[in-house]
Regions:
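A conserved beta-strand element that flanks and buttresses the S-adenosyl-L-methionine
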Residues: 105
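Conserved class I S-adenosyl-L-methionine
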Residues: 1-36, 38-45, 50
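A general structural motif
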Residues: 36-38, 60
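Class I SAM-dependent methyltransferase SAM/SAH-binding core
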Residues: 48-95
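Acidic active-site catalytic centers that drive phospho-/nucleotidyl reactions
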Residues: 16, 43, 67, 92, ...
């Protein structure tokens, strides 16, 4: 386990409380990307899955959300248990071999 993974694993439990997200800004940014329906989206550094609730209204075919920190992924999975469109994976973005995405969000 590297230092980055360790840091984010220790922050996972309180991440949503300490990391401020502006819903208006998130929606504006996503609207400007012209996300289309039925897209395959890769969310790199997904953390606790905050963006997924903003991505789902665009009716994607699939969202693959990756993060290096296993505890972040566990928190995200708890938010979307067994969601048919979202797959949360503990992966390093530099070694992830997924292919064929219409959009990649960093």
């Amino acid at each position: 386990m590297n230092q980055i993974e360790t840091f984010f694993d220790t922050m996972a439990e309180r991440w949503d409380a300490v990391c401020v997200h502006d819903p208006g800004k998130i929606r504006t940014i996503l609207d400007r990307t012209n996300l289309r329906q039925n897209a395959r989206i890769l969310d790199v550094g997904c953390g606790t899955g905050i963006l997924e609730s903003y991505l789902l209204p665009y009716e994607p075919r699939q969202i693959v959300a990756i993060d290096i920190a296993g505890q972040m992924i566990e928190k995200a999975r708890m938010k979307y248990p067994d969601h048919p469109l979202i797959e949360f994976l503990q992966e390093d973005a530099m070694s992830y071999e997924g292919k064929g995405f219409d959009y990649i969000i960093l």
